[in-house]
Amino acid sequence: TFKHKLFLSKIQISILTHHFNTKHNTAPFSKIKNEDFLPAFQKGIELAKAEIDAIVRNPIKPTFENTIEALAFSGDVLDRISSIFFNLNSAETDDEIQKIAQEVSPLLSEFGNDVRLNPDLFARVKTVYEQREKLNLNAEQTTLLDKKYKSFSRNGANLSEDKKNQLRAI
């Protein structure tokens, strides 16, 4: 029945979106079905958007911890799902997996653009970046901050809205 399939789908999404209770935390491939991926990607994007929104809406002044570190740890679920799926797509693909990849790729591109071109998020990153000399960051933190700032800049965060829209269209 539909309810039964919905329940099973939620269990499968759970398998992909939660930490794996397996030796070495490896993906339980025998329990993952191709039809589980699209809803899992949708859930992963939803969770990642919520994490980004929490960073953007944080009323506290931007700091390394509440902006750069939080950004570095955001999207873990989506990253895990993507790693599993795209490794399967590369190593053991079939027509169904390729079809899913065609459906998922635009969703991931749109999400990536929404993050990289988010003016409020970039403003927080830029604020921290401009204060980097005063923050007493260690080498690893300095590298992370530099990479995050440059990634936003190189991916269009400094563009005008018209140019950002042109970039999204590509």
Task: Give the location of each predicted region.
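N-terminal low-complexity segments that are often proline-rich with Ser/Thr-Pro
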Residues: 1-10
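Zn2+-dependent metallopeptidase catalytic domains
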Residues: 9-170
